[in-house]
């Protein structure tokens, strides 16, 4: 229990201490200025620095590594390697994407195909490490059964990592929205990991949560800094990989329901406009529709956080 506390504290302190310096550095660099063109109120956010995810992901990863090694030595190092690799790899992809946006002063950084190839490469590396570590490549499908997919497990792993990293990326459209919702989902999986005595995942999650709590102090409305794709892609990849490690990947469809809804709203909006030239929602992702209805960011954040918390509690009670 002590190591859980220190994992949280280390990540929190590092994030809180160094974030002001990061914000100052990014503001002084004209290349780092970000102008969001999405959302009804995007103009008021012009000039807010991005890539805050780089610091809190680094803080969380370092804290998780220290905590895991302190808890169980080499075994802890090996066990925490996969979740750390997942968040760091996708943070790097997001970081390149953010950097390209800033350099070109555009909404799009990585083009679709190169970005997908980079995400696929990361999934391949993670899959190889899982195979080397002899992690069972089985898929537990609720109400159906357990299947040993063998090499075909890669297809599922690829889909899960790419899908969830992009789902959280779509959710990161308002100050504090993704920070708060993902924090709650990580809390839920921390509770589950405690129940199955997976102490390394608990340490990893405690580190992520500590970093997110620290980041939220700067990311709450009105945000002083955004996490950027650096943070949003990494958070989704982290949730995807730990749901797999815990052996309950499909639970994320419930606990991460907000991310699913955000993604579906974009898909539905795109299909509706493509086939019928009509917008199904006032704006997508769906959190922007609430802005169109006159809600402020705090109200939308509160709604999404509360819904995520209720979903988490219901899920935990059901699994108990």
UniProtKB/Swiss-Prot annotation:
Catalytic EC class: transferase
PROSITE patterns hit by this protein: MRAY_1, MRAY_2
Reactions this protein catalyses: UDP-N-acetyl-alpha-D-muramoyl-L-alanyl-gamma-D-glutamyl-L-lysyl-D-alanyl-D-alanine + di-trans,octa-cis-undecaprenyl phosphate = Mur2Ac(oyl-L-Ala-gamma-D-Glu-L-Lys-D-Ala-D-Ala)-di-trans,octa-cis-undecaprenyl diphosphate + UMP
Record function comment: Catalyzes the initial step of the lipid cycle reactions in the biosynthesis of the cell wall peptidoglycan: transfers peptidoglycan precursor phospho-MurNAc-pentapeptide from UDP-MurNAc-pentapeptide onto the lipid carrier undecaprenyl phosphate, yielding undecaprenyl-pyrophosphoryl-MurNAc-pentapeptide, known as lipid I.
Cofactor (UniProt): Mg(2+)
Descriptive protein name: Phospho-N-acetylmuramoyl-pentapeptide-transferase
Subcellular location(s) per record: Cell membrane
Native source organism of the sequence: Leuconostoc mesenteroides subsp. mesenteroides (strain ATCC 8293 / DSM 20343 / BCRC 11652 / CCM 1803 / JCM 6124 / NCDO 523 / NBRC 100496 / NCIMB 8023 / NCTC 12954 / NRRL B-1118 / 37Y)
GN (gene name): mraY
